[in-house]
Amino acid sequence: MVRGIGTLNNASPLYIVDGMYMNSIDHINPNDIASIDVLKDASSAAIYGSRAANGVIIVTTKEGSNTEGKPIIDLSVNLGISTASKFLDMLDAKGWAEVTTIARQAIGKPALDMATDLANKPDNDWQDIMFRPALMQNYNLSVKGGGKYSTYYTGLGYFNQDGIVKGTNYQRYNIQSKNDYKRGIFSAGTNLIISFSHDKPLHQELRGGMIGTILQSVPTLEKYDDTREGGYGGTYGDVVNIPHPLAIIDDNIMDRYNENVKIFANLYAQIELFKGLKYKLNLTPDFSFERYKNYLNKYDFGLATNSITQLTERQRRRRNILVENLLTFDRTFGEHKISALAGYTYQDSRFRHIQAYGEGLPQGLEEIDAATTNRSNEGNSWRSVLTSILGRVFYSYQNKYLFTATIRRDGSSKFGKNNRYGYFPSFSLGWNVAEEKFMENVHWLDQLKLRGGYGVLGNQEIDNYQYSSTITTGINYPDGNGGLLQGAFPKNFANPDIKWEETAMTNVGIDFMAFNNRLSLTADYYVKNTKDILLTVPIPISSGGANDPIRNAGKIRNNGFEFNLGWMDQPNPDISYGINLIGSFNKNKVIAMGSESGSIKGGSTNQNITTSETKAGYPIGGYWLISTAGYFNSQEEVDAYAKDGKKIQPAAEPGDIKFVDANNDGVINDDDRVFQGSPFPDFTFALNGNMRYKNFDLSIGLQGVLGNKIYNATRQTLEDVTKGSNFLASCLDYWTPENKNASHPRLTWDDPNRNTRAESDRYLENGSYLRLRSVQLGYTFPQTWFKGAIQHARVYINAENLFTITSYSGYSPDVNADNANYRGFDNFIYPTNRTFMLGLNVTF
């Protein structure tokens, strides 16, 4: 998230890797990366047009150099092990039996069959069984070199990471080849990046996903049972019918994987037409191929059964072609420096999806053609085109007064013909105060630069064809004679008036360096206003069941302050150190949502109850929940909580939670929801330090956030004692007349007061934290130890996520969803890994 979220659609930043546009850099080998820069203000990001409104991340990969024909070989090896940094405190068999039995006795029901005769039942800790120390391996080999006219870089990488949950694994193979040639006025080059990945992910199709299955599995569930189909234990009685955790990771029961091949290429040629003027042609094709498989065998887990084999296979293919024609001019005339850029770009993206499904496959034959029943298939495709004309001018006088202006015109096929094009201008001004004559005697000052800028950026990150009407087929209806007629109805109504989202950003900042560049400070204040946000606007049901159309209806404002304060010094040749503090304050507010009552709900629990809402006047994804006010400790308190002589909570008993009637209407319902906070922190920070003593080096990194809230949907599910799954150990501290300060209300199986209702603030927690993100200690071997063959060698140990200081009760307070309306929503999130690593870097 760069300077807050400015859209309710895709808020991911734009990645530029060596000039190639990418949606992410997950497939890039980190060992091949030379530098990463973040463009935040509109004036610097405007040249990239579409999606630059969410920030631009510039990634530059390594390249060759003139080594006079002698290759330089780099080898790196990293081995590590990861564990879950925290386990939740769950009930053991005795505690689970106590909680469920008391809850059921409260309504006159007997104990669960799986909660009796504990001496003859297992006491399984499913977190301990299903989580493991996970091995990580990373090997990289690169060769670079070149001569007078050409340079090259080739990198090979292999990464293998077991997941901390058994049965999960991720492998990636990388190759990069980068070649550059320059002679006289002509230069050309190629850059090829290929990756192949094989992923065995968590099962997410289950109740609460894989993590939810592990945590909800009861401790008396048998690991194995040879008498059942599949060979695993089963649940019975009045308990939740979730699949067996061990069976889920058994490929003979549930086999699934993702395979991805991604190919990115860049070919360029450049010629200097005359002094200072160059023409460059960039051709950037990229392709991705995905194959997904999910096989489900027959099994019997007691209450959860599957009597027929099932197979799903999916293939997806993406192709993107980017062509750029660029003219650049760069000249200096005395004390005047002028740079200019003009260009035209064309981007063509295509996607195709094919999926097949079948049931009744013979054992051992996992092919769609082998399915004997319920065969089905589906497929779809889309095409998107983006054309752009761009220009930029930079002027500098005496390196003191700086001016930059940019204009970009983007045309997107995602909009109708009348709104296809958007214009995005920007400008910036800079003043190098330290270069002025009146600063000549300020010897301790090395740099003082004041700058400011304004720019407009566009966003088109919505699905294709939203401006056009679409029809759903396959809808059958009776013909009056006992037969069926094929029919169709509108899926989406046409809206040719939708247009670009626009973000206008104003930025002022300062760059400061002093004391021989030892002290540095960069600070910025910004205001970021986004208008014409593309939203779905509800329409009446009488329209025929079509989806709500998209309109330009929303406005969002972000404003904040950022700084980077650093100090670095080298007191003597043997010692150097540095420290820097990075901080960001940001506030976001929704200005408009299309109508006075318009809103977008989010944070939906397993009971389909929403917990957050985006509405005008409040932050994005703000929590709207019913407040709680402790317990009713007596029947007199229940009776006294009334409106006009009627109980506000008529189903309540002593030990139940008291909910606040915020609107004073005598009823507890959704009208009593009030704003309870934001999932976005007020302050985000990182503190990094490094030190070198002779050949030893040490680096430490801390990070944290302050002021945000997290909705703990995991806790809400695991404290709901109305069902036969496992619960948090906190449920043992339940209310009784002798324990009125308990952390949990009275135990009751039917919960008529709805004590665990998801829409209450009981599960809203403080999300602030401080984490020791990384500690690395390294040693560089003296070159005198080697006789020419090895130029450089370093060994290091590294630890990540050693500890987190937080009051949050879940696995991790780092809860960040891609969807802004689910930010800060913890619904069985994956635990944070604690990793210990040993590494070796050698240069030949």
Q: Language-model features: where?
A:
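Residues embedded in well-ordered regular secondary structure
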Residues: M1, T7-N9, P13, G55, ...
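Soluble periplasmic/extracytoplasmic beta-strand elements of cell-envelope proteins
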Residues: M1-R3, P13-D18, S35-L39, V56-T60, ...
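Short beta-strands and strand-coil junctions in structured, solvent-facing domains, enriched
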Residues: L8, M22-S24, A42-I47, G64-T67, ...
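Extracellular/periplasmic, surface-exposed regions of secreted and cell-surface proteins
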Residues: S12, Q137, R172-Y173, K178-F196, ...
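Extracytoplasmic gating/loop element in the C-terminal half of outer-membrane beta-barrel translocons
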Residues: T116, Q127, S412, V705-E800
